Every structure is written in C-alpha cells, then in structure tokens.
C-alpha cells in the first residue's frame, strides 16, 4: 500500500511537472514573441493579422480595395502562423504516407490563452475538432468556404472589423462612418502613419538593403509577413513608394522567394514549417 501511495504521488508530481514545463514553454514563446516585436517597435506590438490588414488599408479612406478577394483567406493563414509561432499548434511529424506539408494535420500543442480573441477562438476550434484537419482545410473552414453545413460553425466572422478594432485600441487607426450612395460603411483611416511606415520600411529593407537570398537566414516574422502580404495581394502596396529600379528589384526578389518549393524549404527548419504550409495552401487554391 505504501509503495502504491508513493508511486501515485510520484506520478502526480510528474504530471504537475509536465504541466509546469508546458506552461513555462508557452510563457517563453509569448515572451520571445514580445521581444521580436519590441525589436521592431518599442511601443506597439502587432500580430501578423494586424500587420497584413494595416498594409492592405488605404490610409485616408480606411478600407481595403474592393477588388481584393484574397485578404480574407490571407488573414486566416496569418492566424495559423501566429498560433504556431506562439507554440500553440504544430504540424504532425512527417511519415512515409504523409510527407507533404498539405497532407499533414494541424495538431494542438497547448490550449493556454494567448490574450488575442481571434487566436483563442481558433484555438478552441482546433482543440474541439475530431478528426484533425490540414492547413488548407483550416483556412477554408475559418474563411467559411466549405460545402459542409456542419462545419460552418468554424467560420470566423467579422475578422477584418475585429482586427481593425484592435488597431484602433492600439492607436493606429480611427473609426469613421462614410456614406456610399446606397449604404453607410464603417471605415478605419490610419492615424499613426509612423507605425505603418515603419512596417513598410521593414519589408522594403528585407528585400533590398538587408536581402540575404536565403529564407532560412531571414527573421521568421519578416518571412511570414512577406508570404502573407503576397498571399493577401497587398505586397504591391508595400513597394509602391520605391523608385522604378528598386521597385522592380524588390518585386523580383519577393517573387523568387514565394516561388520557392514549400516542400523543400519546409524540411530545412521545423520552426518555419507552418509558414511554408500556408504558402503551399495558397499556391494550390
């Protein structure tokens, strides 16, 4: 009896230790996330989704292009990459039958809250879903592009508006009402142009002055943002202020980057697997 009691206690202690280690890992992931963001901006920390939307917004008008039908799915891809970078989800390890990025399922690593409503809502969906789904399927489900009525519950609604409200709270956007003949629309003009210009310059520098010609040597968040900006069709907005020569160079380098084989690049570093899986999903769609 004594032996069983001690063994049970050791098991309980072991489980508590595992939970403590996992909790500490999540805290470290979030702390690393904060440190990376602080390196970019000492005052304001943005998620990948917020950065993509900010790049897509017209500064004065406060809305994205009516012709852009890519940004919705791009924002959902940003959510998956953000969760992976924060240590909440990961791709299942490759096997003989499942080597390709788009064949491997998205698995839950930790369900501890991130503090971001959209991220935590997605995390709950991923946790509750059986069987597990692939990156491409999750982007479709979160966007609402599914023929299965039982899976419409996974659609994230009003994503752009919710992200815009976050940016309003962070002092980057403001909220206005504009009349468009037949209807009124809520818009979010940019008020903190310094923050947007910092973001634009960061991406411009990544393919010009700081170009390394090797995605494995790039900052992970910068790589992710370039992939998402391309997939969301807002990359041209980033380079539009450049001179003709620099514009051509930047676009060509960005094109070379996103035309790399995700399957090859994804095997080089596990930390960037989700980035390349998201790119592979957009390449296929």
Swiss-Prot record:
Gene responsible for this protein: GOLPH3L
GO molecular function: cargo adaptor activity; phosphatidylinositol-4-phosphate binding
Alphabetically ordered keywords of this record: Golgi apparatus, Lipid-binding, Membrane, Phosphoprotein
Region (Beta-hairpin required for oligomerization): 176-187
Pfam families on file: GPP34 (PF05719)
UniProt biased composition (Basic and acidic residues): 10-23
Residue numbers carrying Phosphoserine: 112
Role played: Phosphatidylinositol-4-phosphate-binding protein that may antagonize the action of GOLPH3 which is required for the process of vesicle budding at the Golgi and anterograde transport to the plasma membrane.
Any single biological process term in GO: positive regulation of protein secretion
Protein residues bound to a 1,2-diacyl-sn-glycero-3-phospho-(1D-myo-inositol 4-phosphate): 67, 76, 157, 160
Assembly with partners or alone: Homooligomer. Does not interact MYO18; differs from GOLPH3 by its inability to interact with MYO18. May interact with ARF1.
Family: Belongs to the GOLPH3/VPS74 family.
GO cellular component terms attached to this protein's record: cytosol; Golgi cisterna; Golgi cisterna membrane; Golgi membrane; trans-Golgi network
Keyword Phosphoprotein (UniProt): yes
Transmembrane regions: none
Mode of membrane association: Peripheral membrane protein
Organism field: Bos taurus (Bovine)
Subcellular location as annotated: Golgi apparatus, Golgi stack membrane; Golgi apparatus, trans-Golgi network membrane
Protein name: Golgi phosphoprotein 3-like
């Amino acid at each position: 009896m004594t032996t069983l009691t001690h063994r049970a206690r050791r098991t309980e202690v072991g489980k508590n230790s595992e939970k403590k280690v996992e909790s500490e890992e999540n805290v470290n992931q979030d702390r690393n996330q904060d440190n990376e963001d602080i390196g970019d901006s000492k005052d304001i920390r943005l998620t990948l989704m917020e950065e993509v939307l900010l790049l897509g917004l017209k500064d004065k008008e406060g809305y994205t292009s009516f012709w852009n039908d890519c940004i919705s799915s791009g924002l959902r891809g940003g959510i998956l990459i953000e969760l992976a970078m924060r240590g909440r989800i990961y791709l299942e390890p490759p096997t003989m039958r499942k080597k390709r990025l788009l064949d491997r399922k998205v698995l839950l690593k930790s369900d501890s809250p991130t503090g971001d409503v959209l991220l935590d809502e997605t995390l709950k969906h991923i946790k509750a879903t059986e069987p597990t789904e692939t990156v491409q399927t999750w982007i479709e489900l979160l966007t609402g592009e599914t023929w299965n009525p039982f899976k419409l519950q996974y659609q994230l609604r009003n994503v752009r508006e919710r992200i815009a409200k976050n940016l309003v709270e962070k002092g980057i956007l403001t909220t206005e009402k504009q009349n468009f003949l037949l209807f009124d629309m809520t818009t979010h003009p940019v008020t903190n142009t310094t923050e947007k210009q910092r973001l634009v310059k960061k991406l411009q520098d990544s393919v010009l002055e700081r170009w390394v010609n090797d995605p494995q040597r790039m900052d992970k968040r910068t790589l992710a943002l370039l992939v998402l900006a391309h997939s969301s069709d807002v990359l041209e907005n980033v380079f539009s202020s450049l001179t003709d020569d620099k514009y051509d160079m930047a676009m060509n380098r960005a094109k070379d980057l996103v035309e790399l084989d995700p399957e090859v690049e994804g095997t080089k570093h596990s930390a960037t697997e989700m980035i390349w899986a998201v790119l592979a999903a957009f390449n296929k769609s």
